């Protein structure tokens, strides 16, 4: 499942290519992609009609596009979901009409998928997606939003599209009402506004968020009997960390995943949070971690942090720090890779 660096790479691509555009048409090829939408497909299409995309915002792994009516288009990527930007040539809306200027788009309509259109898998392609022909559809396309052009485009006459591609159908889109943040700070990365979608209100701030309360996170971890890795991956405690970056942060901080939170000393606890944040910063610089074509950014480009992983997926290999053989253990139904010499279970009290 994409974690913070991978979702942030997607957010940055959406911010570059989509902010300021207006929805001119909606194609729903798989209604299950909207299963979380109140009112179903019709409500989704009606709610997006003529709406401007105001920003691209992320908190942890949660991503949303605020709209000009005060709501947001929320995206849950699940295990295999992708948001891909596409566009070419003089764009037309779903009704075959030429799009008007930004802010004066025709209403969005549903479009029935054309079975005669070739289904070509472009998910692994690294070429800039905005030059792709919109008539080419990726294999697992579920929803497509047709969008107007904007003045900053290299080819202003060209429209664009946002595709939800999802092989396993565990992700989806929905329109959400916005609510105020509990602390009055920004909802997330990408917007200064103190609002976030209602369905993300329970999601904690992530370790790269300037407004995160590190002392508060550490205090809650140190009061818990649960294992440290489970705490790092609790999205209501601190968001954005999944299996990959939990293993990497624990290795960097020399902490064993099964050590209870209450065994963390203040110094080690701070070291763990700082190490996990630093690993994610490094991953973000190279686009995150991609193990296959399912993990790409909004332009279809893969990340390269897999080359720098120190723990995750390295069971049986030498620890690059001490030379011991890395081991794999299942903790709480999740695989954990660690160094038995560097990460001793109870060595966290300092």
Where are these regions (language model features)?
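Structured catalytic/nucleic-acid-binding cores of DNA maintenance enzymes
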Residues: 1-350
């Amino acid at each position: 499942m994409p974690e913070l660096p991978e979702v942030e790479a997607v957010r940055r691509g959406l911010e570059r290519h989509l902010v300021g555009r207006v929805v001119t048409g909606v194609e729903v090829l798989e209604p299950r992609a909207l299963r979380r939408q109140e009112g179903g497909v019709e409500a989704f299409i009606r709610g997006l009609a003529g709406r401007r995309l105001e920003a691209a915002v992320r908190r942890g792994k949660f991503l949303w596009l605020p709209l000009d009516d005060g709501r947001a288009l929320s995206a849950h990527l699940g295990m295999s979901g992708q948001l891909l930007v596409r566009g070419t040539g003089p764009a037309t809306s779903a009704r075959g009409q030429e799009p008007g200027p930004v802010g004066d788009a025709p209403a969005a309509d549903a479009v029935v998928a054309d079975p005669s259109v070739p289904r070509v898998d472009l998910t692994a392609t690294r070429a800039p997606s905005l030059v792709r022909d919109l008539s080419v559809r990726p294999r697992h396309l579920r929803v497509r939003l047709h969008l107007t052009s904007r003045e900053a485009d290299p080819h202003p006459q060209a429209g664009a599209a946002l595709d939800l591609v999802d092989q396993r159908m565990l992700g989806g889109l929905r329109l959400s009402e916005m609510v105020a943040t509990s602390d009055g700070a920004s909802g997330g990365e990408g917007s200064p506004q103190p609002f976030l979608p209602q369905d993300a209100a329970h999601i904690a701030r992530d370790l790269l968020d300037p407004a995160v309360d590190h002392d508060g996170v550490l205090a809650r971890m140190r009061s818990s009997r649960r294992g440290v890795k489970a705490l790092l991956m609790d999205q209501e405690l601190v968001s954005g960390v999944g299996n990959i970056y939990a293993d990497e942060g624990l290795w960097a901080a020399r902490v064993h995943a099964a050590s209870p939170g209450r065994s963390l000393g203040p110094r080690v606890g701070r070291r763990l949070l700082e190490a996990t944040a630093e690993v994610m910063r490094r991953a973000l610089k190279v686009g995150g971690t991609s193990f296959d074509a399912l993990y790409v950014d909004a332009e279809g480009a893969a990340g390269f942090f897999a080359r720098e992983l120190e723990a995750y997926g390295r069971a049986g290999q030498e620890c690059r720090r001490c030379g011991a053989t890395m081991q794999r253990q299942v903790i709480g139904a999740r695989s954990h890779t660690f160094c038995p010499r560097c990460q001793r279970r109870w060595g966290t009290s300092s």
